[in-house]
Amino acid sequence: MSVLFLLLAITRTASVKAAEGDQAADFLPLCEAWQATKALANAAYKLPPFPPDLTDILNFNITVAPEEWKAIFTDGGSDNTWERFAEGHKNTLNGGNWKTRWEHIKQARQDTKEASSPWNALNSKLINTATVNTTRAYIASIADEAFDLYQGTQTPLQTPKALEAASLAEAAKAILCSDPLKPTADGQACTDITATPSKAATCPTGRSSKGGAPIGLDTVCLCSTNKPSMHSRRRKAAAVMTDGQLKDGILKKLLAACPKKPTLNEPAAAARHAVTVLATRLAQKVARAEEGQIILGTRAETDCASSGSACVEYTNFFKDGDGLAAVPWVKKLLAAADFYDTIEKRKESDKNAATAIAALKSALIREFRRPGQEQTLATTGTKSSSPQSTQQKASEAEANCNDKAKETECNSPCKWDKEEKDEKKRCKLSEEGKQAEKENQEGKDGKANTTGSSNSFVIKTSPLLLAVLLL
């Protein structure tokens, strides 16, 4: 805010009488915009790599999975694809889709199938084999949640249309430079004015054409004039023209007179600050410009391209009602600032996802160390009973059958045994019922979770049945 008041004070003094350094306040916002653009050009975004913590989670998950499930992924060859598997198991998959996970599960199986593998050498001792059956579903739910977090980081960022470039680095080149100033290879500068061309042939003239294409050319045209009173002592010799000819290498010399650092360190904020100060300067100039011209600087002759003027004209952008945001370099600079903010937010989101995946791995390892049947679900913080053993479930089913005292009540999966001496046990669980109960329980143990998510590690049928179908 103090900078803004200072610039306003400079403006009011200049409006009374042109003096040495009159254009300094008009020059500074261009300096700020130049420096902010260079800082924005350095910002880039890459999709994060596959997290090592997620690799460990998937490896733990496949290690505790039923053997029938492991068999699906044991073949690490290129022919073992999701598409091939899905085509052969349309009915048993029941809408499940592992396409994004398939290759990662295959890799997890390759990492763990040999007992002497490097991963097993480091991690197998963490697995509590005594509680595998009770932890299996919980570990799989962690794998699901962790993989979903990773998938959320894999959507490419789309550059905004207003940027008119594929990256901030490419956008910066257009913001800083245009003919006759070409961007350098690194995008951090422009080639300079050479061979002293005329200002009238190089700078935009009058209302028939517009300034504002790049910052570099606006800077050259603003500061190139034949009147020494328009410049500070530091730039007087460098910028003062003779015979209306621009000075050789003038852009580099002008930029050397800019402050070494922008007012604000954060690039997007610095860019918006530069545009705000520029808008303030233009607003102060309207009252003293003829016929409502919108100019940056001071017009001394017919237009800003004349040798006696030190200005850049933006009238046409305001005449059409679009205002400062329609000036090409301003429009692109603001779009670049917005995209920079998007990149920073995405980086923070990716960092949070990595932290959450690491926390899930820690929860997984704690679960291996915790005895007992009761599991705590990481996603909700609520408790649910872990899958009971096959033997327990079979015993419960047998007891349910035994409760049937009459043959007419003893229906499938129970079977009436009239030869049984114990009258209380004549209705008993059939062999088919016992097998169904076993397969049902093994299916629960082999699932990643019990939600039925279509893109999870769940095959919506018994892994044992799937293994049979693969044969």
Swiss-Prot record:
Biased amino acid composition, Basic and acidic residues: 401-447
Disulfide bonding pattern of the chain: 401-414, 410-427
Chief location of this protein within or outside the cell: membrane
Entry function: VSG forms a coat on the surface of the parasite. The trypanosome evades the immune response of the host by expressing a series of antigenically distinct VSGs from an estimated 1000 VSG genes.
Keyword vocabulary terms for this entry: Cell membrane, Disulfide bond, Glycoprotein, GPI-anchor, Lipoprotein, Membrane, Signal, Trypanosomiasis
Residues of this chain annotated as glycosylated in UniProt: 61, 133, 449
Bilayer topology annotation: Lipid-anchor; GPI-anchor
Matching SUPFAM superfamilies: Variant surface glycoprotein MITAT 1.2, VSG 221, C-terminal domain (SSF118251)
Gene3D superfamilies found in the cross-reference section: Variant surface glycoprotein MITAT 1.2, VSG 221, C-terminal domain
Biased composition (Low complexity): 379-392
Positions where lipid (GPI-anchor amidated serine) attaches: 454
GO CC terms in record: plasma membrane; side of membrane
Positions of the UniProt region annotated as Disordered: 373-457
Residues of the signal peptide: 1-18
Protein name (Swiss-Prot/TrEMBL): Variant surface glycoprotein WRATAT A
Localization per record: Cell membrane
Feature: compositional bias, Polar residues: 448-457
Propiece residue ranges: 455-471
Membrane-spanning residues: none
Organism: Trypanosoma brucei rhodesiense
